[in-house]
Amino acid sequence: MNEFGDSMIRTLIVDDSAFMRMAIRSMLASSPDIKIAGDACNGKEAVDKSKSLHPDIIIMDVNMPVMDGLTAVKTIMSTDPVPIIMFSTLTVEGSKEALEALQLGAIDFVPKSESHHDVNKIEKELVDKIRNIHSSNPSILRLINMRKFKGEVVRGKWSCAGDFAVLIGSSTGGPSSLEQVIPRLPGDLPAPVFVVQHMPEGNFCKQLAERLNFLSELEIKEARNNEKVTAGVVYIAPGGYHMTVKKALGVTRIKLIKSQPVHAVMPAVDVIAESMLDVYGKNIVAAILTGMGFDGAAGFKKIRDAGGSTIACSEDTCVIFGMPKAAIAAGGIDTVKPIFEIPEEIVRMSEVKCNGK
C-alpha cells in the first residue's frame, strides 16, 4: 500500500521521444499491478514530477534535452530518492552512460532495442524489474545512503602462491555493490577473482571493468576466451557468455561458452561455480551480493559442501535480496555480512585458504 491508498506500483516514464513514452506505456498496460503516474520529456521535468507525483519507480532515458538523465538521477537521488531504472541503448556510449547512472544511484537498467522482435523480451524484463525492485524499496533506500561509505583497502598476510580462487556473484544492484567490495581488496591478493555480474551482451561489462580498474589496486578486466588465469587479476564475465575455468597441463585458462541461458541468464554464477570446483576444489572463497532469482544457490551449496567458504550480503544492505536469500535457504552460506564488511570477510577467508590456519 502506497501513500495514495492503493497497492499499485506508480511509475513515472521519462524519455524525450513521444514514441518511446507511448511504447513504454503500451508495454506496461497489460500489468494490472502497474499504474502510469505520469511522464516527462526531459530530466528537469522528471525532477519536478518526481517531487509532485511521488512515483514508486522511475524509468529514465539517458540522452535528453534541457537536463540529461545522468543529471536527473544525481538530483533525484540527492534530494528525494526514488528507485530508478535506466532505459539505455547497447552502444559503447550508451553502456558507459548507463553504468555512470548506476554509480550515481540508479538501481538497474533495461537495454533498448531497435528491433521490433525484442519487444516482448524487453516488456517482460521491464515488468519483472519494476516488481522486484518495488518490493525491495526499503533496502534500496538504505543502500543509497550507504554508498557514501568508502572504506580502506583491507590488508592480508599471505604465505601461499595462488592455490585458491575467489568468486563474486551479483545481478540487480551489482555495479554499486561491486564498487563497495572490489576496490577494498588488496593488490597482493594471491588468487584470481572471478566476477559474474548479470549483464546483457554488449559493452556494459567492459565499461564496468574499466571503472573498477580505475578504483582498485587489483587489475580488473573483462575476461577473454582461452586467457591464462593469473593471481591478482579480477576477471569479469562478458555479457552473453558463460564463463568457466579449465586446467590442462598445469595451466588454468578461462573458457567462454556461448550456449543456453541458465536460470534465464548468461553468464550464470552456477556455471562458473561448477567449473571452479573441478579446478580448485575446496580452495574457493565465494560471495554473493545482490540480485533477483536464485542463480548461485546450487553452486554455493556445492562449494560449501566441498569445503569452500561462502558469504552472502545481509538483507538490510542488499539491493535485491533474491539471490543471497536463495543461497542461504539452500544451505550454501557460511556467514552473512553487511556489504561493507564483505571485503574483510573475503580477506579473512582467503588467509585461511592460503595459510592453512
Swiss-Prot record:
UniProt GO BP: chemotaxis
Keywords recorded for this protein, A-Z: Chemotaxis, Cytoplasm, Hydrolase, Phosphoprotein
Catalyzed reaction equations: [protein]-L-glutamate 5-O-methyl ester + H2O = L-glutamyl-[protein] + methanol + H(+); L-glutaminyl-[protein] + H2O = L-glutamyl-[protein] + NH4(+)
Gene3D superfamilies hit by this protein: 3.40.50.2300, Methylesterase CheB, C-terminal domain (3.40.50.180)
4-aspartylphosphate sites (modified residues): 61
Locations listed in the record: Cytoplasm
SUPFAM superfamilies in UniProt: CheY-like (SSF52172), Methylesterase CheB, C-terminal domain (SSF52738)
GO cellular component annotations of the record: cytoplasm
Record-annotated CheB-type methylesterase domain positions: 159-353
Keyword DNA-binding found: no
Gene Ontology molecular functions: phosphorelay response regulator activity; protein-glutamate methylesterase activity; protein-glutamine glutaminase activity
Domain of life where this protein originates: Archaea
Record text about domains: Contains a C-terminal catalytic domain, and an N-terminal region which modulates catalytic activity.
HAMAP family: CheB_chemtxs
Name recorded for this polypeptide: Protein-glutamate methylesterase/protein-glutamine glutaminase 1
